[in-house]
Amino acid sequence: MANMVFSATIGAVLALMLIFSVSIDATTSTQNIFCTTDDERNHPILCHMLQLVEEDPREMADYLYQHAQENKWLVGHDWSDDSEFGKMSSSVVASTMSRQLLRSSASKDDNALPIVFAHGMGDSCFNSGMQSITKKAGEMMGVYSVCIPTGKDQSEDTNNGFFLNMDATVDVFAEAVQNDPKLQNGFNAIGFSQGNNVIRGYIAKYNTGTAVVNAFLSINGVNAGEGAVPHCNPSLSKSPFAQKLRFDVCELLMEQASRAAYTDFAQQHSFQANYWRDPRPSAFPRYQQYAQLAKWNNEAGFVNQTLKDNWAKTNTFVWVLATEDGMVFPREGEWWQSPDPNDPYHSVLPMKETEWYTKDLFGLKTADEAGKNHFEKFEGDHLQFSMEDFERWIKEYFGK
């Protein structure tokens, strides 16, 4: 049984989780269109932020983006060759990206599969880092490459990463895939952080017909769920909008990393609540009852055979772990390991000892025995991989 490194501050974290799981007075000056009085009492932070998203979506998205940037949750935002993108507005970046892809399409191998990206929390397909890595991947492999947003612009795409639930996000993603003629013969997929849940959800629900995921590169995915409050520094923003916020993004995540995640309201309005997997055995029944992740894992008390059948249609799975990941707990979950129920905060079960493997709940064991699972890692924190690593991964696993 492998040992896990766990922060000495666990006592403080658990205390804060308890604080945010109890009732807090969340009276607002205007009627919250999403929340009943009970919702506001049980989910004060989520309700407050949902209201602000409705009132000023652009300001909220800018705030979330800045917070993600400060915490290094974004892919490639500090790459040296991003400056040309950083000088342009989101709409110009998207237009430029489309033109570049169209210009090179004539020289592409028509038989090679395109690449589809799903971004992580706080990021957006309209941001420079995602635009840059999408372009790089297409050029490396000589294929059509696209990042699929879950909103019509940067603001909606960013906000939806927090406030559109996981299942609805997958439906939006799937509709975009179905409407793109270049993806109808199948594609290879790359997920970053919680974007892996989008790809995974697509495989679970939509991996049928011809538009199937051939190979799935999962980089620092919360595949096995999130079991603790992720590394999160409070925002440094001094903007007028930030002053309107009574709560910080870290407090929002902390509220979802608690009993508050396991309610119908949280599951409907919070992407992060959908994959909160409380590692304590006492919490497992509520996880089974409420969490979207439990349904996709076939942990909800019944087996959906369609999920297993759809999983089997993907030929290659590449699971990438960051050795110092401070966002995903346990970080070994990026390799489908899970907290040991007997000591959930200090020890993990190897993948082959987990229940989802031994019982082959959704097809992980079948895929492993067929040689479909591959495991990679890089030294460093969440999403801080090198371009050399990225190029090696896609050339090795997408070039087959």
Specify the residue positions occupied by each region the protein language model found.
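Extracellular/periplasmic catalytic domains that process cell-envelope and extracellular macromolecules
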Residues: 107-110, 181-183, 190-192, 208-212, ...
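Short catalytic/ligand-binding loop motif for oxyanion handling, primarily in non-cytosolic enzymes
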Residues: 124-126, 156, 197-199, 224-228, ...
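Serine-hydrolase catalytic core
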Residues: 262-331
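Flexible, membrane-associating and regulatory peripheral segments of lipid-active enzymes
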Residues: 2, 6-11, 19-139, 145, ...
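C-terminal catalytic-base region of ester-bond hydrolases, centering on the histidine
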Residues: 48, 306-400
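Serine-dependent carboxylesterase/thioesterase catalytic core
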Residues: 33, 119, 167-283, 327
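Hydrophobic/aromatic beta-strand patches that form the interior of the parallel beta-sheet core
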Residues: 116, 146, 190, 217, ...
